[in-house]
A protein has these predicted regions:
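Secretory/extracellular carbohydrate-interaction modules
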Residues: 52-114
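Asp-box/BNR beta-propeller blade signature and adjacent active/binding-site loops
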Residues: 190-527
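Short tryptophan-centered beta-strand motifs in secreted/extracellular beta-sheet-rich domains
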Residues: 70-72, 133-143, 147-149
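Extracellular beta-strand elements of beta-rich domains used
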Residues: 27, 183-185
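Short carbohydrate-recognition loop motifs
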Residues: 38-56
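Short, aromatic/His-centered strand-loop micro-motif at the edge of beta-sheets
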Residues: 116-137
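Flexible glycan-contacting loops in extracellular carbohydrate-active proteins
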Residues: 159-179
Length: 527
């Protein structure tokens, strides 16, 4: 076809390319554009995408392109934090499946997005001279299975991927405000006959902004006895949020509720906000109805590096279904927690904790026989000389023994077993694969799941009571993790985790686990 309704069309030669048509996109209006998330607009001859919260996209939909070259000039507004990314999308089959180049502060990362994962990395280059606040020219070409990425007229790399061959084009912003102009599309164009489809997402956001600075992290989810799900998480302005003028009490514990098995969530509310940075919360409802939220606290300390003191592990509880909460009680002054309290089959409570001294870390547990009113002295788990950061979670096995999984510092996590109800533990042994902040969960079929950070957000599963583990299963390409899981009413599993980076949010995905592996399920499909 010939494009005659836009500014100009010329025939040109591109390196290694056949004759192609060139379209200069008219940016005097938003005609032909689709902005699925909002936060994008045409303004003064520019496409403007505000990605300070979320990652807004803009698809140009009148035409589909094969053997395409997408070229544009872009600028990302300067900011102290955030990756300050502008992305170029090509071969968009729908709103979830496309190639894209992620131009951030100093990198150009070529990826493929699909229904299951938005970040299938193909190739990257770093150390680019690409300051924010300056206009740059980006370009991505896709001919057959060959992809090329350019910046400011220079070819950065060429690679191959056969997955996608044609579709729409577009742009996005990430953790910054991006401006795009001088958009030129070259290739074999044909008028699009169908609207751009947006398949249901494989994840939902539990919370994108709890009102404390738009940084949400370290989630934990459980089912309440009234059937609802509760997800607690840390809310602040960054990975550590000490009190300041904007957040006088520092980071806090927030929560959201779901009455539809995790598909939608209430706006965030504050569960606990002490005078310091309260973080890494976990939540459980005991058999007697008591709801306990455990967390740990950091207090600002000038002149130190890092600039805080740890105040240990704490808890608050509610005996009236969250109408009121107790005053905080300290569980331990020297140990910290990143996992939930577990109620054992005999009714006792056990909490995995951890400590570090002189560069050495180890896991530990503490026990309660009175529903959390008092806690035993901490029982250490010998790290066996392993380098552990040792965030510890516990699961009760079918034979009554207890299995502890511990965060690794180097190439592997650690594990230990107790055969006397948690009073003593075997020396930690290497699990054989890396992971941060493991979370253990048993499915209705008896499969034990262990979700963790590294690589990215991942999980393993065991069919033999933690004796052996599956190969790694990728959950998501975001790298925050600190995951948590709960069984839904249909037997599927909901996993929550966090994104990391400026504007980090809490995500949730749904899957079913069998002896054959893990199958991901759309979130909008009613459980």
């Amino acid at each position: 076809m010939r494009i005659t309704s836009v500014v100009s069309m010329i025939v040109l030669f591109l390196p290694l390319w056949s004759l192609a048509e060139e379209l200069h996109v008219d940016l005097s209006s938003d005609q032909g554009w689709v902005f699925p998330e909002g936060n994008a607009r045409i303004e003064k001859g520019e496409l403007v995408l505000d990605g300070r919260q979320g990652s807004p996209k803009a698809f140009y939909t009148p035409y589909e392109w094969n053997d395409v070259a997408l070229k544009a000039t872009f600028l990302v507004e300067p900011a102290e934090k955030g990756v300050l990314a502008c992305g170029f999308m090509v071969c968009a089959v729908n709103g979830n499946n496309y190639y894209y180049v992620h131009y951030d502060r100093g990198q150009a990362i070529l990826c493929r997005s699909d229904q299951d994962n938005g970040w299938n990395e193909i190739k990257r280059v770093g150390n680019l001279d690409k300051p924010a606040g300056t206009w740059h020219q980006g370009e991505v070409q896709c001919q057959g299975d060959t992809l090329r990425v350019f910046l400011n007229g220079t070819l950065l790399y060429e690679t191959q991927d056969p997955t996608l061959s044609g579709g729409r084009v577009g742009f996005y912003a990430g953790e910054g405000v991006a401006h795009v102009k001088d958009i030129v599309i070259a290739g074999e164009a044909r008028p699009a006959t169908d609207p751009l489809a947006f398949p249901p997402p494989m994840f939902v956001h539990v919370c994108t902004d709890a009102g404390a600075g738009a940084y949400e992290a370290f989630p934990d989810v459980c089912r309440l006895q009234d059937g609802r799900l509760i997800c607690v998480f840390y809310a602040g302005y960054g990975h550590v949020a000490m009190p300041n003028d904007q957040l006088p009490k520092g980071g806090r514990v927030s929560y959201c509720l779901s009455s539809d098995e995790g598909r939608t969530w209430t706006p965030a509310q504050t569960l606990y906000d002490g005078p310091d940075d309260d973080r890494d919360p976990s939540i459980v409802q005991l058999k007697n109805g008591r709801i306990i939220c455990n967390y740990f606290t950091l207090r600002a300390a000038e002149g130190k590096s890092p600039a805080w003191d740890g105040l240990g592990a704490w808890m608050v509880y509610s005996d009236d279904n969250m109408a009121t909460w107790s005053e905080p009680r300290q569980i331990s002054g020297d140990y910290y927690c990143s996992s939930p309290i577990r109620q054992l089959s005999d009714g006792r409570l056990i909490l995995g904790v951890y400590a570090e001294k002189d560069g050495k870390g180890w896991g530990a547990v503490t026990l309660s026989e009175d529903n959390g009113d008092t806690w035993s002295p901490v029982i250490d788990i010998d790290n066996g000389g392993m380098r552990l950061d040792a965030e510890t979670d516990i699961i009760e096995l079918k034979d009554g023994s207890l299995h502890a999984a511990q965060r690794g510092r180097d190439e592997t996590m650690g594990w230990s077993v107790s055969r006397d109800g948690g009073k003593s533990w075997s020396v930690s042994r290497a699990m054989g694969f890396p992971g941060h902040c493991p979370y253990l969960h048993r499915t209705p079929e008896g499969i034990i799941l262990m979700a963790h950070r590294l690589p990215e957000t991942s999980l393993h599963y065991s069919l033999d009571e933690c004796t052996t583990w599956s190969e790694n299963v990728l959950v998501d390409h975001v790298g925050g993790a600190y995951p948590s899981m709960v069984t839904l009413k249909d037997g599927s599993i909901l996993i929550v985790y966090y994104e990391e980076g400026a504007g980090s949010s809490i995500r949730a995905k749904r899957f079913v686990a069998t002896s054959q592996g893990v199958e991901w399920l759309p979130m909008e499909e009613k459980p």
